[in-house]
């Protein structure tokens, strides 16, 4: 299986609008305006396809037969040729220009336009990787200068330019005896001579000439967007630790969604429209006869919008909450459980990239509904003969045994692991493995349906079809068989609705509407295209073929209309029939009906539970009054402990309490929590969290003028951890980590930072290098159970 990387394409479109597009032929007949209309439509469709599918392609537009001249070679005699747009990304402005384009007033030479187009391609693609192509759209009614033709041919081959000629009013085929210009040359018209010449020229440069009607049909067909072929995985397929096969993975199937909508400024749009109107008025005043673009008048206003989000508390809407002060909360019952960034990082599972075989199973043991997510295809590493042979033999063995392999798949380093399965696929020219995710028990929806199989003893007899019904069903299936609905030229059946040839009608209709809206912003969306309508409606060939089978099936399975119950509630007193209905059930005369196992079940309802003793009003369920509570009070207002889930926020909330003084308690609890995090940490698991707590404790002590409490605690930690079991934590918080974490090391609070501190700058500089005596830390309460109890306290 070979993979090709599509290159960017540089295209020059040459459109003939000269006098020949509307002139009289030599036989006296007058060509209709459909010639130039077909030419414009073909160029418009080409631009439209490039706008939709060719995201990286660039186009230029050249006109032949204009009254004026505008090109880089005009000083050398290339007259009546106008370059409307250089080779650039296609734009809506070019489409609008084409829509309002009028026929030219002069005659231009086709060969001269090809030379101008090649000059544009050379200037654009010099030292760049581009595929180069020229589209020439003409009816060949104007004279063509054939001098120096060999030089033009050589230049085409030298710069490797592909030529596509779209012939307006060209014959689909020309007989060989008519291709010779020497035969009956006098009897041929100028158009016939030019048509023969262009066919020969296109063939000499390996180009293609297509009549305009055929070109319109091809460009009107649906097509899919070209995408860059990139590997999604490069690594080894590990069958055993001793057997590893290098493979490459590619994305094979992914749902194509509609393009995402972006918000734009309506105010800026109005300003652009005003500028465009002013520019049009200026062009009229200048009488711009050559249809040249005025670059100075183009709007310089952008429609893009920058979106900024601000957060405010419901109870304190005047103060903005900064993003660093926000954290995520997960709903657990009726409570919100806050999770800090550190907690989220701890929840993530880190794994190395791998594609490891877990085991093998029969292919029939994996139902079709187990396919999840996108499909990937795996092939052997290109150029590695040993891996090709090993993978090929392995795939053929899976096919012979009708088995698939279950694998553990981690696409990238530290990525999420997936359980999936790989199916072998063998073709005449390549072999590969297709991969899909396997669902877990949480992903599968289990539903209970009433049995309808004739072989099931629990099936009701009324649900078992008879022989005639089974025969009618089989005939209906056979008549609508997509494998036998169409036939090729040899009479062999062809499968209908192949996914590779069936395009999404929603996407196609969207792009047509998008194109229409870009050119006509104030008109209605166009009606559904007939070709798209064929996609969304049943195929007429199949429907005609199965018409009798559908009738027989309807006769064998007659449908009876069910009783339609009134939707007027009986308890409202407005319905004398005593019936009520809602979405899921129906009540008639005090009996509530609902569907169960395909049957309508009735259940008697006691209306006393719905009305008061006097029958005046329905009872209302009592609801607890939570008007005095708010989310802020729930998660912060009544905090009296520094927990393990979010100790930093708990500490802040306790310091901010105004109904009681909890400063001393908050500092004491924070000290205990820091020591607990360090002692309970598996290696450095909680070091960062403890580090954040120490930083916040230091800030809080400075704020509350409790510098001595922090300085004493820091000295106690040095005695406890330095040069001991947790010396790595002491080095973690006191090392110069500015270049790594962007944070300064933890140190004492000095007199310059807080008036209550007695630490001088000299003592600060000596502190981290000073050795101290052994210190016994204060006892930590509920070290083993505090985190669990604290979690339940938060939930309650």
Curated annotation (Swiss-Prot):
**How is the subunit organization of this protein annotated in UniProt?**
Heterodimer of ku70 and ku80.
Q: Which domain of life is it from?
A: Eukaryota
Domain named Ku is located at 240-471
* Summary of the function given for this chain in its UniProt record: Single-stranded DNA-dependent ATP-dependent helicase that plays a key role in DNA non-homologous end joining (NHEJ).
Chief location of this protein?
nucleus
- Composition-biased stretches, type Low complexity, lie in 272-285
List the keywords (alphabetical). ATP-binding, DNA damage, DNA recombination, DNA repair, DNA-binding, Helicase, Hydrolase, Nucleotide-binding, Nucleus
GO MF annotations in UniProt = ATP binding; damaged DNA binding; DNA helicase activity; double-stranded DNA binding; hydrolase activity; telomeric DNA binding
Any one GO cellular component localisation term in the record: nucleus
Q: Does the keyword Transcription apply?
A: no
Enzyme superclass (EC):
hydrolase
**What name is this protein filed under?**
X-ray repair cross-complementing protein 5
Q: Which Pfam families does this one have?
A: Ku, Ku_C, Ku_N, Ku_PK_bind
Matching entries from Gene3D superfamilies are given as:
1.10.1600.10, 2.40.290.10, Ku, C-terminal domain, von Willebrand factor, type A domain
Q: Where in the cell is it found?
A: Nucleus
Q: Which InterPro entries match?
A: Ku70/Ku80_beta-barrel_dom, Ku80, Ku_C, Ku_C_sf, Ku_N, Ku_PK_bind, SPOC-like_C_dom_sf, vWFA_dom_sf
Q: What is known of its domains?
A: The VWFA domain interacts with the KBM (Ku-binding motif) found in a number of DNA repair proteins.
Question: From its record, what is one biological process in GO terms?
Answer: double-strand break repair
The source organism is: Dictyostelium discoideum (Social amoeba)
The EC number of this protein is: 3.6.4.-
- Identify the stretch(es) annotated as Disordered: 272-302
User: Hey, which family's this protein in?
Assistant: Belongs to the ku80 family.
Q: Where is the VWFA domain?
A: 10-205
Task: Kindly indicate whether the keyword Nucleotide-binding belongs to this entry.
Answer: yes
């Amino acid at each position: 299986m070979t993979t090709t990387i599509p290159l960017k394409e540089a295209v020059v479109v040459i459109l003939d609008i000269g006098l020949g597009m509307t002139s009289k032929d030599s036989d006296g007949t007058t060509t209709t305006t459909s010639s130039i209309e077909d030419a414009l439509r073909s160029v418009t469709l080409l631009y439209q396809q490039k706008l939709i599918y060719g995201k990286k392609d660039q186009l230029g537009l050249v006109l032949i037969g204009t009254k004026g001249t505008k090109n880089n070679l005009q000083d050398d005699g290339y007259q009546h040729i106008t370059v409307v747009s250089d080779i650039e990304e296609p734009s809506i402005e070019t489409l609008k220009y084409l829509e309002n384009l009028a026929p030219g007033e002069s005659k231009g030479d086709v060969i001269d336009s090809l030379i101008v187009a090649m000059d544009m391609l050379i200037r654009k693609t010099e030292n760049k990787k581009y595929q180069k192509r020229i589209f020439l759209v003409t009816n060949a009614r104007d004279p063509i200068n054939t001098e120096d033709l060999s030089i033009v041919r050589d230049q085409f081959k030298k710069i490797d330019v592909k030529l596509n000629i779209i012939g307006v009013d060209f014959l689909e085929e020309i007989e060989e005896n008519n291709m010779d210009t020497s035969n009956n040359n006098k009897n041929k018209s100028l158009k016939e001579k030019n048509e023969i010449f262009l066919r020969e020229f296109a063939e000499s440069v390996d180009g293609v000439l297509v009549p305009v009607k055929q070109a319109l049909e091809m460009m009107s067909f649906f097509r899919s967007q070209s995408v860059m072929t990139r590997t999604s995985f490069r690594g080894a397929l590990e069958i055993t630790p001793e057997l590893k096969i290098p493979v490459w993975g590619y994305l094979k199937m992914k749902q194509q969604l509609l393009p995402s909508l972006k918000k734009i400024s309506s105010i800026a749009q109005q300003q652009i429209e005003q500028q465009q109107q002013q520019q049009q008025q200026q062009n009229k005043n200048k009488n711009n006869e050559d249809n040249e673009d005025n670059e100075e008048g183009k709007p310089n206003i952008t429609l893009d919008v920058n979106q900024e989000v601000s957060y405010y508390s419901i109870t304190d809407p005047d103060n903005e909450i900064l993003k660093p002060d926000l954290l995520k909360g997960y709903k657990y019952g009726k409570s919100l459980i806050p999770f800090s960034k550190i907690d989220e990082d701890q929840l993530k599972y880190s794994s190395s990239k791998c594609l490891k075989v877990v085991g093998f199973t029969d292919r029939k043991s994996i139902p079709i509904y187990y396919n999840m997510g996108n499909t990937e295809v795996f092939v052997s590493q290109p150029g590695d003969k040993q891996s090709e042979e090993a993978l090929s033999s392995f795939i053929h063995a899976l096919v012979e045994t009708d088995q698939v392999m279950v694998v553990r798949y981690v696409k990238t380093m530290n990525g999420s692991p997936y359980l999936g399965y790989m199916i072998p696929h063998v073709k005449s020219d390549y072999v590969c493995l297709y991969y899909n995710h396997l669902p877990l028990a949480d992903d599968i929806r289990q539903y209970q349906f009433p049995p309808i199989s004739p072989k099931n003893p629990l099936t009701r007899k009324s649900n078992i079809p008879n022989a005639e019904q089974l025969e009618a069903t089989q005939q209906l299936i056979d008549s609508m068989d997509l494998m036998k609905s169409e036939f090729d030229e040899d009479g062999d059946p062809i499968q209908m609705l192949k996914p590779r040839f069936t395009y999404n009608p929603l996407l196609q209709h969207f792009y047509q509407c998008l194109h229409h809206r870009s050119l006509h912003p104030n008109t209605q969306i166009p009606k559904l295209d007939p070709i798209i309508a064929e996609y969304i409606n049943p195929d007429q060939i199949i429907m005609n073929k199965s018409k009798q089978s559908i009738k027989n099936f309807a006769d064998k399975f007659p449908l009876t209309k069910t009783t339609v119950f009134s939707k007027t509630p009986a308890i409202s007193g407005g319905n004398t029939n005593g019936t009520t209905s809602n979405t899921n059930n129906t009540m008639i005369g005090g009996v509530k009906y609902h569907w169960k196992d395909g049957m309508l079940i009735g259940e008697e309802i006691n209306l006393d539970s719905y009305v008061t003793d006097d029958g005046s009003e329905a009872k209302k369920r009592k609801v607890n009054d939570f008007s005095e509570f708010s989310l802020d009070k729930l998660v912060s207002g009544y905090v009296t402990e520094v927990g393990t889930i979010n100790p930093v926020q708990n500490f802040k909330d306790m310091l901010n309490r105004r109904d009681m003084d909890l400063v001393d308690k908050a500092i004491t609890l924070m000290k205990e929590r820091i020591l607990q995090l360090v002692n309970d940490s598996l290696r450095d698991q909680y070091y960062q969290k403890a580090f954040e707590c120490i930083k916040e404790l230091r800030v809080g002590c400075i704020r509350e003028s409790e510098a001595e409490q922090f300085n004493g605690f820091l000295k106690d930690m040095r005695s406890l951890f330095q040069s001991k079991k947790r010396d790595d934590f002491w080095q973690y918080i006191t090392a110069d980590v500015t270049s790594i974490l962007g944070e300064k090391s933890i140190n004492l609070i000095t007199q310059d930072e807080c008036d209550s501190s007695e630490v001088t700058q000299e003592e600060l500089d000596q502190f981290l290098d000073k050795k101290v005596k052994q210190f016994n830390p204060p006892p930590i309460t509920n070290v083993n159970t505090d985190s669990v109890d604290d979690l339940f306290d938060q939930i309650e």
